[in-house]
Amino acid sequence: MTKQSGVVWQIIYCLIFFIVLMNLYYLGREWLAKPAKLTLEKDGVQLYKSVVSPDKIERWRELCKTKKYKELKTEMHSDKNIQEVVKSISPEYILQDYIWIIQKSSVHTCHRDNNGKFFNEGQKHDSYTMLVYLESMDKCLGVIPGSHKSQYTNAVNITESVEDIICSAGDVIMFNANLVHVGTLTEKDDNLRVQMKVSHPDDLAVLNYYQNFNKVLNRDNNNPRILRQMQRSVSCTFPIVSDFTQSENISSSRGTDNGAEISSAQKLFSWLFYGRTDFYDLPNAF
């Protein structure tokens, strides 16, 4: 064996060791996952238990199954219990004209949401993302508590671990859009949940790209699970990378159905992390 080939094999062994180590770390975090007791003000995220009644859960599941998404949106936006969660921030806050039905798959890379104050010039108030779970999940959402307070404190997380929140059907999670968060990798890929946006009326003009926004995500992720685990771990170590793409994410958020252009870089990212170039180019629900 030549000296040069010996160096190559050393590099290969190091890469294999790193991959194994990252996966052991990720699996260890999954095994230790426990219910999180977090508050919206302090941690940037909060779990609200049993917001949706069993009858409405069944009703809304059926509306999703039969693709009656407009009817679903009307019922969810007018639901008294959901409105109480919205108003718990402040009586002035409202649901935006927005719904995103997630029937399959999840975003398994750490990121902040487009509607965060960090990324929208002229935005005066915090904006929030609400997730309504219509099925129980062993892990619903991964978060880095407190990361909403500064764009730079959790830009790189060498020792910081993501905390997985456990929830049941009918529960609601609401989080500050500035919060670093990530979808969970569970045994099932088709856990039904619905995402909505909660904002202050003063900011609707700035966040107008999320008005009349009605999307459905029902796509398989074609990448192997072990690769997704690695991508999740690396992206949550360096969430600052995602911050650099926010401007482009906002400009293309409405999708080609509404005339937005998806760049080559974004298509490449979608292919690398989700196995298809059009993963983020979602069709209109109605």
Give the location of each predicted region.
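Catalytic core of non-heme Fe(II) oxygenases with the double-stranded beta-helix
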Residues: 106-167, 206-214
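N-terminal auxiliary "cap/dimerization" subdomain that precedes the catalytic jelly-roll/cupin core
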Residues: 6-93, 168, 227-286
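N-terminal Lys/Arg-rich, disordered targeting/topogenic segments
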Residues: 1-3
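Conserved double-stranded beta-helix
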Residues: 150-286
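Short, solvent-exposed loop/turn segments at secondary-structure junctions
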Residues: 52-54, 101-102, 135-138, 148-149, ...
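A short coil-to-beta-strand element that immediately follows conserved catalytic motifs
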Residues: 90-100, 142-143
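Short, glycine/charge-rich beta-strand/loop segments that flank catalytic centers
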Residues: 73-78, 97-107
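A structural signal for short, well-ordered beta-strand segments
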Residues: 97-100, 130-132, 196-200
